Amino acid sequence: MAKKTKKTEEITKKFGDERLKALDDALKNIEKDFGKGAVMRLGERAEQKVQVMSSGSLALDIALGAGGYPKGRIIEIYGPESSGKTTVALHAVAQTQKEGGIAAFIDAEHALDPAYAAALGVNIDELLLSQPDSGEQGLEIAGKLIDSGAVDLVVVDSVAALVPRAEIDGDIGDSHVGLQARMMSQAMRKLSASINKTKTIAIFINQLREKVGIMFGNPETTPGGRALKFYASVRLDVRGNTQIKGTGDKKDQNVGKETKIKVVKNKVAPPFKEAFVEIMYGEGISQTGELVKIASDIGIIQKAGAWFSYNGEKIGQGSENAKKYLADHPEIFAEIDHKVRVHYGLVELDEDDVVEDTQVEDTQVEDTSDELILDLDSTIEIEE
């Protein structure tokens, strides 16, 4: 007879031998029928921390709380037209490829610009692209890619463009009430388990619609029914704000726009946080710009007047020059980025970080002990 563990003894004491034996028999039968791990005690799971992949934006990683998009979950990105939804998704594609993963893009809108994707860092030669003829076909392709377990990220652009086959075959003007909602509901039921099992990140881009006759409250809604809202672990609301003017010869031109990304739903961290990013036309999210702003706000980059400094060395007069310096020095960019992530608890401390902290603490202890020795000497002299 196997030796009882402390946990087993506690369960036996609480529930009794007969009930525990019945439970063990049931668990063995379930494991036999459905495989190992079909049912387990939550504390026995080897991996309890949610794995994440960076979104490609430092500000968004901080807003998400966990440091990026959770693996094995469904993400919805929605917002008005030209707000930057596809740009945010393409940065996730580029980040996936940067980390050695495989990404797929289901282009239901038939509007993906390869040149723009390449400018954002996407390796278009390695990107899997599908332009389906119908919504069912697009979701089936996404399902097969996810089931393979070889794809790390699947992006569907967009839910509104996933037109059911019956609507395509019908005439314009025919009523097709609830067809798309039923299609999405069925797809979510089929895909959610496979997404979790394969640890694939599924990003669904969605558009906005307005409800008719709404006098009070928010009239905005997203097409495709409510299933995606329920199954999504993270929902991002992307809104373009003010235009960004250029400098020098381009001072009268709009070169980008400030964009607000609000985390309206988050199952892995506290929701309702906001990220403010600069989306530059033709370039995507300004990663150097957000790093300069965030690092200077928390004191990693020092700012005195118009000058920005790091580790006592001036890196530029004005934010534009500071951004250019970081773009020209990727090793400094990576070092500051790591320190910011450590500050917000998005990554674990490296050995170098721990050593630096330990050295500071040791110095403080030595200084304190010297002061104590001096105080004791003074006391002895007074007593003498």
Swiss-Prot record:
Keywords: ATP-binding, Cytoplasm, DNA damage, DNA recombination, DNA repair, DNA-binding, Nucleotide-binding, SOS response. Can catalyze the hydrolysis of ATP in the presence of single-stranded DNA, the ATP-dependent uptake of single-stranded DNA by duplex DNA, and the ATP-dependent hybridization of homologous single-stranded DNAs. It interacts with LexA causing its activation and leading to its autocatalytic cleavage. NCBIfam families: tigrfam_recA. Pfam families: RecA (PF00154), RecA_C (PF21096). It is found in: Cytoplasm. One of its GO terms (biological process) is DNA recombination. Its main location: cytoplasm. Transmembrane segments: none annotated. One of its GO terms (molecular function) is ATP hydrolysis activity. The gene is recA. Belongs to the RecA family. ATP binds at G79, P80, E81, S82, S83, G84, K85, T86. The lineage of its organism: Bacteria, Bacillati, Bacillota, Bacilli, Lactobacillales. PANTHER family: MITOCHONDRIAL DNA REPAIR PROTEIN RECA HOMOLOG-RELATED, RECA. This is Protein RecA. One of its GO terms (cellular component) is cytosol.
